[in-house]
Regions:
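Long hydrophobic alpha-helical segments typical of transmembrane helices together
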Residues: 158-180
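Short, conserved alpha-helical segments within structured domains
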Residues: 20, 68-71, 104, 128-137, ...
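Catalytic and substrate-binding regions of cell-wall glycan-acting enzymes that process beta-1,4-linked
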Residues: 150-158
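Phosphate/oxyanion-binding loops and surfaces in catalytic or ligand/nucleic-acid-binding neighborhoods
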Residues: 57-61, 147, 170
Length: 180
C-alpha cells in the first residue's frame, strides 16, 4: 500500500513460497518476502524499511510523521514481537503447539484491546490522520479478522473494527488488491 501511496512504480512478482526462485536468493540471501530491488541495485528486504524508503521518496499526507516516530516504532515492534507469533498460530493452529485457535484468539486479546483503546481516542492509532503505524499494522489485523470475521465484527473491539473497515473500504487498498 505504501508503494502505491507514494506512487513508486514497481514490477511485482508473485513468489510461490514453497518454490522460491533462485533470483530471489541472489538478491536477498534471507529468502523472505518482500524484496525490493532499487534501480541503483540496492536491496531492501524488510517491510518497514521498504515503507520508510517509499515515504522518504514521497509522503503527501505525512504518514511518516516525525513527531510520532518513537510511538510508531513502538507499536510496530509490539506487533512484530508479540502479536505476529500469536497471529501465525491463530491462522494455522494445526501447526501450533496448542492446536486450538480459540486459545490463540484469547492470547491476542491484550494486544487487540490496546489498539482498540488507542482508537477510542482518535480516528487512527496515533492521532486523527493516518500514520505509518496504521498502514504497517493493518495487514496483520486484516489477517486476524479473516480467520473469523463474524467473531471479530461482534467482539468488543468496535473502534478497531471501524478502523479496519476504513482501510478495507479505502480506494488505495481496493486499487492495490485489484492489481493482484
Amino acid at each position: 500500500m505504501t508503494l502505491a501511496y507514494s506512487k513508486i512504480k514497481v514490477e511485482p512478482r508473485e513468489v510461490e513460497l514453497k518454490n522460491k526462485p533462485q533470483e530471489m536468493f541472489l538478491a536477498s540471501p534471507k529468502g523472505t518476502v518482500p524484496v525490493l530491488i532499487l534501480e541503483n541495485g540496492r536491496v531492501i528486504d524488510e517491510s518497514i524499511e521498504i515503507m520508510i524508503w517509499a515515504l522518504t521518496q514521497s509522503d503527501p499526507d505525512g504518514w511518516l510523521s516525525v513527531g510520532q516516530k518513537d510511538k510508531c516504532h513502538e507499536l510496530i515492534h509490539l506487533n512484530d514481537i508479540k502479536f505476529k507469533p500469536i497471529l501465525d498460530n491463530y491462522k494455522y493452529p494445526q501447526k501450533s503447539e496448542k492446536k486450538d485457535p480459540l486459545y490463540y484468539r484469547e492470547k491476542a486479546q491484550e494486544y487487540l484491546y490496546k489498539l482498540n483503546s488507542l482508537l477510542m481516542k482518535n480516528h487512527f492509532l496515533l492521532g486523527n490522520h493516518i500514520n505509518m503505524a496504521d498502514v504497517a499494522l493493518f495487514p496483520f489485523i486484516r489477517q486476524f479478522y479473516m480467520v473469523d470475521p463474524q467473531w471479530f465484527a461482534q467482539s468488543g473491539y468496535k473502534y478497531l473494527h471501524a478502523w479496519l473497515q476504513f482501510f478495507l473500504d479505502s480506494e488505495l487498498f481496493l486499487t492495490v488488491m485489484k492489481k493482484r
